[in-house]
Amino acid sequence: MHKINTWEGRLVNKNMKYLVIGDVHADYLPFKRAVNFATENDLHLICVGDLIDNGEDGAICVSEMLKLLETGKATMIKGNHEHKIIRHLNGANVLLGPPNMVTLNQMETDKLFEHEFRQMVEEYCQEYVKLNDTLYFTHGGMHQDFWEAEKTGNITRRMYDDMMFGQADYKKTFHHKGQDYPYRTYDWKDSVPGHVKLFVGHDPAPLTGEPNFDSFQPEPTVYVNEQGGTTVWLDCGAGKGGKLFGVVVNSSTNEIEDTIDFTQND
């Protein structure tokens, strides 16, 4: 069952400003700087997913995010890493890699971590969120047919999968740290409507296709398609040796007012 993907009931002022951050991957110091910046500047924090895995700080990142969620000061998108870990915890047979094992090994001895993670995912994580029909936030991407399907409420399982995983060519793979990953495809970016800004994470080297997770964009990528629809890729490799970036978004103007690097040679 999917949660209602709107801001209503989330204690959010629709005319306020937001700090939207990329994938954290359990890298606490830059995440804490982002939280502090949002708090000091009265910004609602939006994480576009993948708060956990890879890094060693998953427990404290989840605990801090949960406090923000419970007080209505943050919104959490479900990333593919949250999706995989919660499925494993619930008994599903999923393929686990080294990044996942960092989290699961910690949960074996830290049951509070597991409890708070479950609470975060089951009570608060959403596949996508929209604001004023012009600002959309998800993890991996939006299926080309999503924009029409949303109008009628006929959002399919495939569309929800694309929100978490993006799209890929499974006939072509890249070997990375013991696992094969499909090449990523980006045709969906050209279907974003002209009035929409779409913010995503997931991909630290967008528009290249090759899933080389040791290669990171130096700052968020902004792509504008022919009809004026905008996609912003925020993942810059935090928790993997890269950086954590955030953008300040004004919901009254739909503009990005600032781009901030929260990594300081950690």
Regions found by a protein language model. Give the residues of each.
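N-terminal active-site segment of His-dependent metallophosphoesterases
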Residues: 1-64, 74
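Catalytic phosphate/metal-binding cores of nucleic-acid and nucleotide-processing enzymes, i.e., regions
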Residues: 5-13, 20-21, 69, 94-95, ...
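Binuclear metal-dependent phosphoesterase catalytic core
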Residues: 219-266
